Amino acid sequence: MTFTAFTMFLVFSTFSQSMMVNRTGTITIMFTTMLFFLSMDIVAMSPGMTLFNNWFNLTPYNLPLSFLMLSLIVMLLMYSTSNHRYDLKSPFYLLLLLTNMMGLLLFPLVNDLIALYVVMELQSYSLYLLTGLHSRSYNSSRASLLYFLMGGVASTIMLLASYFVYALTGTTNLSDMAMFYSYSNAFDYFDILLVALLFKMGMAPLHRWSIAVYNYAPTYITAYISMVAKMSMVSWIFANANLFHHHVTILFFYISLAMAAYKPLFQVNIKTMLAYSGMLNFSYILLSMMSYDPAFYIYMIQYVLTHLILFLGMLGASQYVNSPISIWSPLTFMHQLKLPNLTLAFSLILALFSLIGMPPTPGFYAKLFVLSAALQDNYVLETCAIVVCSVVATYYYANMIKVLFNSSTQKVTNFINPSLAFTMASATSLLFSFFMFMPSLSEGLYLITL
């Protein structure tokens, strides 16, 4: 259905305004999400099924992640369905996003190394074009070129790993490789593939390029590429965690944890701080992957909710900036967070409290589940390290909260548009009432792991 929508809008975007294309496309993706939700039967799917000559594997483990990505895309697209003070309309935005969405939804299902590379490139090339969509911006073009160069290096490493695996096993299908696990060192080369994927995700120590890309790209493009692209890759890694050795994951875990806790202490750029915040969150996700626990799903949900509110809040706060740094990223520095809208400031403060891990926000429950699962699997040192680094990271979260607390209600002529306000209100309500759904959510995750 996504491919059909792409073909239709490829023609429709030529004869229509970008706003109409964005609105129609958002409705199409919402309808796709609804169909996906109504047809999803996780219990009946166990143990799973293969598609397209065993190239893709549909299991109860990757279905919830695909639905989560679809929901995130819908909520991010709501921003482009109405006019804003600093508008960046483009008729190609939705086409590139639909192309990227095909790669995103197929990536967690991949069961073959050839399909893995093809789907990765489908996802990556659309992201390169999305990043450089506004070519009048020098920073946007620079971000797109840097993203393309670093993504090309990671893709080369992926091909190298696939070559070594095929040379040893004689197959590229992951299901067929299961028989080689006990007496072959083919799975050592999957660690090279893991390094390539973590490189593409921007995990430390291979992270400097991603910080630059997120900083140079327009804010609403940064919101998309910093969340959705990482989610698809980490979903595939979690679904195929048995292919990788933990020593590589632990190495990236410790370095990412240290960098994400220390580096933002000296930052005043909000997008850079949120990029390091995402790295800290993915350190928790790496820990849950090592223990292979359903806490992974809970943490992914809270990560999506909190970062969605923060990025949409930045876009909403941009409406009140009278002296923008640029029209592509009006809100850039922390001192600009003094907002005349206390309700918006409250939503941002609530999301930051969730990142800190204050109860009863989702961040508290997600971190509790991840750390409990890690301790049960005897990851004691890793648990102590992540607690210490999270306490250090609290400083820069608290610094942002302090600036937001200085906000005051003022009479202004610029207002947030209704679609963005509705999305922010819905996400904030879900964030605030997350603890009410925890029993049902835990029960559902238990059924997945049976």
Curated annotation (Swiss-Prot):
Recorded GO molecular functions are: NADH dehydrogenase (ubiquinone) activity
Location, primary (coarse class)? mitochondrion
Where in the cell? Mitochondrion inner membrane
Q: Which residues cross the membrane?
A: 25-45, 58-78, 90-110, 113-133, 145-165, 186-206, 219-239, 248-268, 272-292, 295-315, 344-364, 385-405, 414-436
Q: Which UniProt keywords apply?
A: Electron transport, Membrane, Mitochondrion, Mitochondrion inner membrane, NAD, Respiratory chain, Translocase, Transmembrane, Transmembrane helix, Transport, Ubiquinone
Q: Which reaction does it catalyse?
A: a ubiquinone + NADH + 5 H(+)(in) = a ubiquinol + NAD(+) + 4 H(+)(out)
Q: Name one Pfam family in it.
A: Proton_antipo_M
Topology of this chain in the membrane: Multi-pass membrane protein
Which branch of life, at top level?
Eukaryota
Question: Its Enzyme Commission number?
Answer: 7.1.1.2
Can the keyword Transmembrane helix be found in this entry's annotation?
A: yes
InterPro entries (UniProt xref): ND/Mrp_TM (IPR001750)
According to its UniProt record, this protein's enzyme class is translocase
One Gene Ontology cellular component annotation?
Answer: mitochondrial inner membrane
Can the keyword Transferase be found in this entry's annotation?
no
What family does this belong to?
Belongs to the complex I subunit 2 family.
What this protein is reported to do is described as: Core subunit of the mitochondrial membrane respiratory chain NADH dehydrogenase (Complex I) that is believed to belong to the minimal assembly required for catalysis. Complex I functions in the transfer of electrons from NADH to the respiratory chain. The immediate electron acceptor for the enzyme is believed to be ubiquinone.
Protein name in the entry: NADH-ubiquinone oxidoreductase chain 2
Query: What is the originating organism of this protein?
Result: Debaryomyces hansenii (strain ATCC 36239 / CBS 767 / BCRC 21394 / JCM 1990 / NBRC 0083 / IGC 2968)
